[in-house]
Curated annotation (Swiss-Prot):
It holds the Pfam family NAD_synthase. Homodimer. Disulfide bonds: none annotated. Catalyzes the ATP-dependent amidation of deamido-NAD to form NAD. Uses ammonia as a nitrogen source. This is NH(3)-dependent NAD(+) synthetase. InterPro entries: NAD/GMP_synthase, NAD_synthase, NH(3)-dep_NAD(+)_synth, Rossmann-like_a/b/a_fold.
Length: 274
């Protein structure tokens, strides 16, 4: 199988979608998971104010609200967690996103003290973290907090990973990539926008430039700058359309380079890396 055939088979992106149908597909998927696992009662999600967490949060709240209405069980809850490192540059967007999704519970945990303590402890041991490595430390601290909250509320940590992000491995291993359930996987970036438009989301939340915003020295660095390829090109590639050869090569290189992120810890029986 050629590399593009393999990528398209793995990422499961349809060339065209019906936004309403995809919304229902994700909501029913989330509901089915909790109904099957009756010891679980909540969804926990970190909210940044960007497109992906806004969409995921809205879908999670819809699923929880429907479960409560269908079962009469008020223990079903959604926890939307703000996890700033100090002060977030686009805090107003995060508040707009929270207002749009209207979560049952809003929590804020500032991760700055925890991250800075880890950086200082490592420095004391002779390990000086680069700004990039510190960015990954932030992502992992955020996930640690979400799992702590989930542990206290019979919760599932929901991920925001979609296929345009998965194909490039554009997330932190065991950080934002370390979740329990990903309701957006199969969608690319533009399809996520279509779902938010269908849901009546304020446009500025999905038309803004996507950024992981993890590095202190490069605040709000656009994803497309970091990747060297645009989301339109990634989306076209995943929909089976023609893209410039250099863009295709970059996408395929990211896919190969980050394949380890899409696997659990490697064992002697794995051969994908060889």
């Amino acid at each position: 199988m050629e590399i593009r055939e393999r990528i398209l088979a793995d990422m499961q992106v349809a060339e065209t979608i019906d936004a309403h149908e995809e919304i229902r597909k994700s909501v029913e998927f989330l509901k089915a998971y909790l109904k099957k696992n009756t010891f679980l009662k909540s969804f926990v999600l970190g909210i940044s104010g960007g497109q992906d967490s806004t969409l995921t949060g809205k879908l999670a709240q819809m699923a929880i609200s429907e479960l409560r209405a269908e079962t009469g069980d008020d223990e079903y809850q959604f926890f939307a967690v703000s996890l700033p490192y100090g002060t977030q540059l686009d805090e107003s967007d995060r508040q707009d996103a929270l207002d749009f999704m209207a979560p049952d519970n809003r929590l804020t945990v500032n991760i700055k003290a925890s991250v800075d303590a880890s950086v200082a402890a490592l420095a004391e041991a002779g390990v000086e973290l680069s700004d990039f490595a510190k960015g990954n430390e932030k992502a992992r601290e955020r996930m640690k907090v979400q799992y702590a909250i989930a542990a206290m509320h019979k919760g599932v940590v929901v991920g925001t990973d979609h296929s345009a992000e998965a194909v490039t491995g554009f997330y932190t291993k065991y950080g934002d990539g370390g979740t329990d359930i990903n309701p957006l996987f199969r969608l690319n970036k533009r399809q996520g926008k279509a779902l938010l438009k269908e849901l009546g989301c304020p446009e500025h939340l999905y038309l803004k430039k996507p950024t992981a915003d993890l590095e202190d020295n490069k605040p709000a660095l656009p994803d497309e700058v970091a990747l060297g390829v645009t989301y339109d090109q990634i989306d076209d590639y995943l929909e089976g359309k023609e893209v410039p050869a250099d863009a295709a090569a970059k996408i395929e290189n990211w896919f190969i380079k980050t394949e380890h992120k899409r696997h659990m810890a490697i064992t002697i029986f794995d051969d994908f890396w060889k």
